Amino acid sequence: MIPSHTAPSPFFPWSHRMNTAPECRTPPLSLARAEVRQLPVYNAGLSEDAVRAKYGIPRITKLGSNENPYGPSPAALEHWTEIASSLFRYPDASAEGLREELSRQTGIDTDRIVIGNGSEQIIRMICEAFLSPGDRLVTVLPSFGLHLIWPQMMGARAEAIPMTADARFDLPQLHQAVTSDPLKVLMFSNPSNPVGCLMTGDAMQSLIDACPADTLIVIDEAYWEYARSSPDYADSLTILKNQSRPWMVLRTFSKAYGLAGLRVGYALTSDPGLTAVMTRVRDPFNSNSAALEMARLSLLDQEHMHKTVGATLAEGKALKAALEERGYFVAQSFANFLFFNARESASALAERLLEQGVIVKPWKEKGYETWIRVSIARPEDSQAFLAALDRVRQPSHSSAA
């Protein structure tokens, strides 16, 4: 662990007195826009250090953030010292090197690629660039939280269509939603986060065709590397590239490439004009130089990525079977996580797991308060989770239903 210091800094001798400043007479929240005052706070999950400090547990099993436990490409890491030696320079604001490699691998021209500080920033940029107060966005429920939060920040109406009872896309309801009122943006993740299910190619094509011609289609493919080997996976780029409508496909280096700590995401767009609009709201140096180069080098090591994805998918099958043996309904997943119905308060169960040193993510959206998302990691992490689960789950759930 990197050491930290709590003593006052000799460079800022007043720093130890800052907590004695008089309280502001104007409530800070009153200064915020109405949309911001009503904005929910995104739950980014707990860190290992926070759990360790609260419960005094030395070993933490972190299964709440869908990280790749196998880490970045070793071949990319060999260049880390070289990368670090130039950190005194500003990064390339155009991210040209990374965009060129992405173009080579995806077939999308560089002027149709946008780089972001994680795909979260890309989602925010989309909302800032294209949503006005009163505009309507349709997504699904449960969903990645920022699909709802960022539209609300812009004063847009975010309408979330619940999944079916068996945790699949409710296609009839989605069709009704995209045709009932004017629609500015359709945004959903595929594979779904947090459920993990896939939308088939025919279903995706039908849903897109049902949208108004000027609706921006945004497909968040943060977990596509885990799904693309499945015969059920529909290549969104193949479906979208022949569409004469605006679209974006979002992807990230945080999951399969193991670069969550560096924050690199990207958007593939239908038109250079969309890229130009996004550039208007993009911070000039929004991605740091280490992140850009590590992402580029990681793309060159597809063998490592495929190896870690394969190990994750194999472990996912074993973990899903183990949860089902314990009587839980587990949604079909094509990602590096599982979504299961705990049949009790997910928050309460997650808290008891924390006391055992295991971090999972309880869902809190209405209608899903008994569901938990657990990341698929190494076999030993799964075993630690299952052992803790067996110790703390309610007696009525101790045998298969």
Curated annotation (Swiss-Prot):
Record's keyword terms, sorted: Amino-acid biosynthesis, Aminotransferase, Histidine biosynthesis, Pyridoxal phosphate, Transferase
> Which sequence ranges are marked TM in the entry?
none
Question: Per the UniProt record, which EC number(s) apply here?
Answer: 2.6.1.9
Assembly and binders: Homodimer.
Query: What protein family is recorded?
Result: Belongs to the class-II pyridoxal-phosphate-dependent aminotransferase family. Histidinol-phosphate aminotransferase subfamily.
GO terms under biological process: L-histidine biosynthetic process
Chemical reaction(s) catalysed: L-histidinol phosphate + 2-oxoglutarate = 3-(imidazol-4-yl)-2-oxopropyl phosphate + L-glutamate
GO molecular function terms listed in the Swiss-Prot or TrEMBL record: histidinol-phosphate transaminase activity; pyridoxal phosphate binding
Which PANTHER family does the record match to this protein? HISTIDINOL-PHOSPHATE AMINOTRANSFERASE, HISTIDINOL-PHOSPHATE AMINOTRANSFERASE 2
Taxonomic superkingdom: Bacteria
Report the top EC class in one word. Answer: transferase
Its needed co-factors are: pyridoxal 5'-phosphate
Descriptive protein name: Histidinol-phosphate aminotransferase 1
Which pathway? Amino-acid biosynthesis; L-histidine biosynthesis; L-histidine from 5-phospho-alpha-D-ribose 1-diphosphate: step 7/9
N6-(pyridoxal phosphate)lysine: which positions carry it? 255
Name a Pfam family for this protein: Aminotran_1_2
Q: Which cysteines are joined by disulfide bonds?
A: none
